Amino acid sequence: MVIVNVILGSNRQVAIGKQLFKYLENQIAPLVGERDEITFKFITLDQYHLDFFHEDLPPINNPERKLAPNEQQWIDDMQAADGYIFITPEYNHSIPAVLKNAIDYLAFEGNRKPAKIISYADSMRAGQFGGEALREVINRLGFITLPMITTVGKVTANFSPDGFLLEDAPSGAYYQKKLLETLHEIGFYSRILKGHPYQEFNSKV
């Protein structure tokens, strides 16, 4: 079974991203998961209670890490996945500190695994600068970031707080199709790369 982690990148109690997150969890993931034999694991960062990153060495240079149980759980959950969806808003043309901090704990868990970015906002700009900023961060850690960011604007005009498309959603059909394609795309590449992992180049050949 292929596992894809869906990660909400905001811990704000009133984050409108929760509406999008719940919509994916309740409406879209069951459709794509059953058809494509994908398990989508929905993750909120507040479940890990991560402190600000405080290790003496960068994780990629520290094979002897000693982590607290909650920190190790985050690492283990990311290691177990075959692909990722990051859902992020835009904060001052970047990403939330809580998301950057969680990523800073990672070393090689996402290396050569596919990642899809969904950016969102309550404006038509759809958090696009947050998505682009996130791309640079996860590329540094070796994630294979899929080229096109899925942008979702006017969230509260289209999605209810409990994760349904509103009856009068101005872009409901458009976002339904777009998000179905997003989950199908990450599922496709996760399956391909899990079944055919990259083989390190042997210079002696």
Summary of predicted features, one role per range:
Residues F108-N111, R140-F143, I192:
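Alpha-helix capping at helix-to-loop junctions
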Residues M1-T88, H93-K100, F108, E167-L180, ...:
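N-terminal beta1-alpha1-beta2 submodule of the flavodoxin-like/Rossmannoid cofactor-binding fold
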Residues V4, F40, R112-A115, T145:
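Hydrophobic/aromatic residues located in beta-strands of well-ordered beta-sheets
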Residues K154-P170:
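Short helix/strand-capping connector loops at secondary-structure junctions
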Residues P114-T156, Y174-K177:
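Short, glycine-/small-residue-rich phosphate/pyrophosphate-handling segment
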Residues V98-Y105, L141-I144:
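Short, electropositive alpha-helical surface patch
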Residues Y84-F86, K113-K116:
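Short, surface-exposed connector motifs at secondary-structure boundaries
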